[in-house]
């Protein structure tokens, strides 16, 4: 079996990745790493792993040595050296942080305050949105797993951009996420009394996912795309809903737009275009690798409205990373990801 290592296993994304991979029939999770909990058994940190695994957190160096595929679930700036070591040893590295999502070092420094530490390997990375880059992913050993907000927005807009149907300078992306998107670290904003029974935007006009969204949408459109992106925190654990507003180049018919989306995504296992009249909801994608898209039209403003929903921990992080791994290893893309949302 393919041996898997997770570096950053005790954060929310790393723990979710472990939970999913333990049920994958074709891989073995062989090693875990955590700086904060080195030497501790993972089931002492997350009790849901009791009797499921007795893996002990060790050094990142040892994980790379032992494993065939390495997942890095680390804060920005910490994955490049590990990825370089993995590539030098002919391993696959799937990074779930931000280190490889932007192609421009200048943009990365502007938004993240750091330069690339291993600039020579950035040209080897592929942006891991399977529905966009599947063929490139098949041939790649270094994957930049997309951010959670960008995943909803990019899947929501791709059919329109690929067919040059909308204007590129007035796209509004209004997104709401559960608090797991902020990570496991303690912050005032995610402290229960601060987040419970309220709803508010954050990092307005300054969220680090903005350049990732614009770069990927621009590649789809083969032209510069500008977005107004505003994220909000919902008082729930998991899930994202993005409401996207865009202006068509010409008069559009909602039935024709729906037909376009249905045809575009007909072979995509994890993207579901809802029937006209339905509205996408977090409830129906929770705990799955699915993206649900619903399409609407504001007739008064001649505006297309797309609602795109995912589970931020799965299709927005760990599940999409496994989907990328499956593609690279030649497995069925849905291996280990045949998940159905609970009805309640």
Curated annotation (Swiss-Prot):
It is found in: Cytoplasm. SMART domains: Semialdhyde_dh. Keywords: Amino-acid biosynthesis, Arginine biosynthesis, Cytoplasm, NADP, Oxidoreductase. One of its GO terms (cellular component) is cytoplasm. Pathway: Amino-acid biosynthesis; L-arginine biosynthesis; N(2)-acetyl-L-ornithine from L-glutamate: step 3/4. CDD domains: AGPR_1_C, AGPR_1_N. Its main location: cytoplasm. Signal peptide: none annotated. The active site is at 148. The keyword NADP applies. Belongs to the NAGSA dehydrogenase family. Type 1 subfamily. Catalyzes the NADPH-dependent reduction of N-acetyl-5-glutamyl phosphate to yield N-acetyl-L-glutamate 5-semialdehyde. This is N-acetyl-gamma-glutamyl-phosphate reductase. It comes from Clostridium beijerinckii (strain ATCC 51743 / NCIMB 8052) (Clostridium acetobutylicum).
